[in-house]
């Protein structure tokens, strides 16, 4: 059996990442983390990426309605061990409970930048079919 050298995640990593994402979401929705900043913030978890050995879970989160994302990420990382402990009952099938790390998800910001570029007058002019006929 040969090992793949590509950096694409395996099906198992994707499946476990989705299970961890769902479990973290439930912990946060139930308000089990006693932190005023986390309790008053709506947190969207867009993705959880697992390390190849499934021992590290990196959760990409977007705090909604809060200007200071770094403070929310810091609070989540401060409570990461507690959250990891609360994952146990929902992830019984795992041999090891993964260490959870929280990171700010910048994909939505990237989407907004691309959308703004596509709507810019320069790009709109290039995409307009009427301007091709005039030349």
UniProtKB/Swiss-Prot annotation:
**Taxonomic superkingdom:** Bacteria
- Protein's UniProt keywords contain Cytoplasm: yes
An example of a Pfam family matching this protein is: RBFA
Per the record, the GO terms for biological process are: maturation of SSU-rRNA
- Write out the GO cellular component annotations: cytosol
Per its record, what are the GO molecular function terms?
ribosomal small subunit binding
Q: Where is the protein situated, by its record's location annotation?
A: Cytoplasm
Task: List, alphabetically, the PROSITE patterns matched.
Answer: RBFA
Question: Major place of localization?
Answer: cytoplasm
What are the entry keywords? Answer: Cytoplasm, Ribosome biogenesis
Similarity comment = Belongs to the RbfA family.
Q: Quaternary arrangement and interactors, per the entry?
A: Monomer. Binds 30S ribosomal subunits, but not 50S ribosomal subunits or 70S ribosomes.
Matching entries from HAMAP family are given as: RbfA
Q: Please describe what this protein does.
A: One of several proteins that assist in the late maturation steps of the functional core of the 30S ribosomal subunit. Associates with free 30S ribosomal subunits (but not with 30S subunits that are part of 70S ribosomes or polysomes). Required for efficient processing of 16S rRNA. May interact with the 5'-terminal helix region of 16S rRNA.
What protein name is recorded for this chain? Ribosome-binding factor A
Q: What's the source species for this entry?
A: Sinorhizobium fredii (strain NBRC 101917 / NGR234)
């Amino acid at each position: 059996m040969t090992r793949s050298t590509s950096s694409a995640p395996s099906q198992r990593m994707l499946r476990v990442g989705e299970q961890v994402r769902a479990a973290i979401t439930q912990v946060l929705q139930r308000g089990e983390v006693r932190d005023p900043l986390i309790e008053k913030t709506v947190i969207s978890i867009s993705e959880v990426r697992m390390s190849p050995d499934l021992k590290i879970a990196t959760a990409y989160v977007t705090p909604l309605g809060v200007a200071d994302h770094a403070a929310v990420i810091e609070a989540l990382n401060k409570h990461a061990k507690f959250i990891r402990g609360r994952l146990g009952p929902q992830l019984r099938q795992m041999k090891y409970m993964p260490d959870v790390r929280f990171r700010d998800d910048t994909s939505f910001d990237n989407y907004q930048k691309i959308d703004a570029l596509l709507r810019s007058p320069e790009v709109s002019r290039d995409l307009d079919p009427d301007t091709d006929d005039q030349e």
